[in-house]
Structure formats: structure tokens, C-alpha cells
């Protein structure tokens, strides 16, 4: 009887883990005007992942949505259409709508302080001056959400706003996109193994 109960507990725990949903949010600004800009790297990465899974984005409330599956885990890809500085409204809505836990929500953003193409994963932390991350923290009333920052480099001689809203040159574009496969693997790891293991394996 004890063994039978233990078996059912094991099955319940394993099934519950598989049934967990995940929200992967790529930050950016909607509209052709911002296509291919450094600030929209989150959008571009999600487009890459969506295409890899032979899925498509559909316009929905407060964003574009794509639903995929990764080894039995249900994954919602979200590109907010609220503009970068108001991303929190979209993130909060879809977390509540799909009943997704904070620990299962990964926010992808650009980062001026990281070299081009480098990534940094964190389980929590400050916004680091990123308005999108700041607004999400305000909407969720917490900064304890996992995030993946992608380095876009920096130009000390140019205005930062002009730089992040500028378009990647061909060399930068190639460097960034050559890393997309590795970055998408880090997201798979987050979904399957959690943020701690993923940080240990992918932070570079």
C-alpha cells in the first residue's frame, strides 16, 4: 500500500511538472519603424524560435502570441504590442490569463552593457536602467522574475537612445543571429531544468 501511494505521488509530481506553463517574453517596439533595431532583439529572437517550431504569431490582446510545446511543456511566446516602456501591462495580463507562475516567466531584453551577442541570465535583479524591465517590475510589483539579457554592444560616442533605436549593421546582424541557436537552447534549458542550472551552463 505504501509503495502504491508512493507511485501515485511520483506520477502526480511528474505530471504536475510537465503541465506547468511557461511564458517567454521578447521585448521590443511594434511597427515596421522599429524592425531590425537593437532595442527589438527580443522580438527577433522570438521570431527565430517561432519559425524553428514551425509555428506562427497571431495578434491577440496586448500582443502577438505563439503557442509551442517543448518536451511536453506548454510554452507561450509573447511579443507585447504596448511599446517597450509599457510592457508590464501585457506581461501581467498574459500571466493571469494563462495562470503562469512568476518563476516560469522569462523576459528577454537588449543590454548596452554586454558585448555584442553575449548573454546573461539572472533569476532576479534590478532593471539596470532598462525601461521595459522597470515597467514589468512595477506591473508585477516584483523584480524577482527570471530574465535573459542579450548584449547589443555600445557606442560611447553616440546618444544611447539613438544607438538602441538604430539598426544593426551587416556585421553586427551576422554576429547576433549566429548566436540565436545557442540562445534558444538556453531558453529550452530554462524551461526543462530551471534558471539556476541554465545560468551555470550558459552565462558567458
Name each model feature, range by range.
Residues 8, 16-123, 134-148, 156-159, ...:
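Nucleotide and nucleotide-moiety/phosphate-recognizing core
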Residues 126:
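Short glycine/threonine-rich catalytic loop with a Thr-x-Gly-x-Asp
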Residues 129-132:
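Hydrophobic alpha-helical segments within soluble ligand-binding/sensing domains
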Residues 152:
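Gly/charged, well-structured mid-domain segments that form the phosphate/adenylate-handling core
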Residues 168-171:
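A hydrophobic, small-residue-rich beta->alpha segment in the mid-to-C-terminal subdomain
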